[in-house]
A protein has these predicted regions:
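Membrane-embedded beta-strands of outer-membrane beta-barrel proteins
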Residues: 26-28, 32, 42, 85-87, ...
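Outer-membrane beta-barrel domain signature
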Residues: 13-19, 72-78, 111-117, 154-159, ...
Length: 213
């Protein structure tokens, strides 16, 4: 349970889970650098897993229902087939800036349960890193995940809000050993849940010191 709690810290600690086993996990693709500093990667893959884990809220029996939910998650397990495909684009101009854009479509086929609860259908990752001077780096990272569902007692599932997060990171290098950094998370103040019933913080900031050994 320790390993699974590193993935979902809200998991019911009394649960006993079967180990997941991958019988196939393959990816193929084409990668090419079509111009100086620019390359693309078109890829697709297929994965077969026995006893894949899908996190859903804990539902109380009718006699115990308050708000229906307990304060833990449970893990449904089912044999799953996962097909995916996407494209990854990157562009780098000297040492001034880097741009990346990645889109992935996921298709799930699961046994015994109606849906791949909690898994996104579409994912988009984008980022840009700018280095105006050698000591300063600023990065903007965006992640969008759509098409997620959770289980609230009805087999067809309930739609979850899209993950829609924009983060900003800035670093300043003082010397070869020390540096400063500032990270602003969810600067769009979006409200969503990574796991149903546990909303993510709408905004957070972190400042610190980098030490290179």
């Amino acid at each position: 349970m320790y390993e699974i709690s590193q993935v979902n810290r809200y998991i019911n600690p009394t649960m006993e889970l079967l180990p997941s086993r991958n019988y196939l996990d393959g990816t193929v693709g084409i990668r090419s650098g079509i111009a100086p500093g620019f390359w693309f990667d078109v890829f697709g893959g297929y994965k077969i897993t026995n006893d894949e884990v899908f996190f859903v809220p804990t539902l109380l029996p009718p006699s115990l229902q308050g708000d229906i939910f307990a304060n833990t998650s449970v893990a449904m397990q089912a044999n799953a087939k996962h097909a995916f495909g996407g494209v990854n684009l990157k562009y780098s101009y000297q040492q001034l800036f880097d741009i990346n854009l990645k889109g992935v479509y996921n298709s799930w086929n699961v046994d015994d349960i109606e849906d791949a609860y909690g898994k996104p259908e579409m994912e988009l990752t984008a980022g840009i890193t700018v280095r105006p001077i050698s000591q300063v780096t600023a990065s903007l990272d965006y992640y969008l995940a759509t098409g997620r569902k959770t289980f609230l007692g009805r087999p067809e599932g309930e739609k979850m809000k899209n993950i829609n997060e924009l983060n900003l990171t800035g670093t300043y290098t003082l010397n070869d050993t020390f540096g400063l950094y500032l990270k602003l998370n969810n600067v769009l103040f979006q409200k969503y849940e990574l796991y149903y019933g546990y909303p993510m913080q709408s905004f957070s900031a972190m400042i610190g010191v980098n030490i290179n050994f």
